[in-house]
Amino acid sequence: MARGGSDVAETRARLLDTARHLFAERGFEDVTVREICRGAGANLALVNYYFGDKLGLYLEVVNQAIAAVREFNSLAMTAPEGSDAEKRLRLFVRGLLHRVFELRGVDSWVHRLIQHELSRPTELATRILQEAMAPRIRYLAEIVAELLSCPKKDPRVMHCVASVHGLCLVYSRIVLANQFKAAMPDLASDGPFDVEDAVAHVSAFSLAGIRAMRR
């Protein structure tokens, strides 16, 4: 009996959802098609039917991850045309931190999947970096190079890019983490976290550091 359209869509969606979480948890190599199908409650043959093979399923998951990162990037790359470098940096920091703040507590399967690709790369690693990560890094590198008045290949540029980018992302792991307050209550603020305070701090700290690198 032919499968109904809604059944096909639901089964395919379950396979993708299960694959996303398993690939993000353990990486491509350590996950089997059998595990994915068992978790999705689907017949083993359906991975081949819908996606061709395990790599085809992984490619679909990677495409979803790239789309999610592109949306993330768009919030940090919104400076009006003609904005000076300092304003662009502040808007970059604001966009990134607001997105990190919005996503706190949300399952970060995209981040975990990318981390697996960086540590144990598959044939898709370069594509993920080029299409998902590179646009944001290049955008920030252009800002930093302008602030430093140097070519983008100057080693100071990527040092500063890593510092600014890392400082933004660390808030999701320390300042915003419930575990931080539980483990170090003496350092945790009593009041609610204000993302604009973080934006002001990271922007000022980053700009001061970049200015110091010009000397």
Regions found by a protein language model. Give the residues of each.
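N-terminal intrinsically disordered/low-complexity leader segments
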Residues: 1-10, 177, 215
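Short, leucine-enriched amphipathic alpha-helices that occur as contiguous helical runs
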Residues: 8, 12-16, 20
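Helix-turn-helix
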Residues: 14, 22-56, 60-64
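Hydrophobic/aromatic residues within well-ordered alpha-helical segments
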Residues: 54, 61, 65, 132-136, ...
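Conserved phosphoryl-transfer catalytic core
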Residues: 65-77
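Hydrophobic alpha-helical connector segments
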Residues: 74-109, 157-164
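Hydrophobic/aromatic-rich alpha-helical bundle segments in the mid-to-C-terminal region
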Residues: 105-111, 126-134, 143-203, 213-215
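Short helix-capping/turn signature of helix-turn-helix
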Residues: 115-121
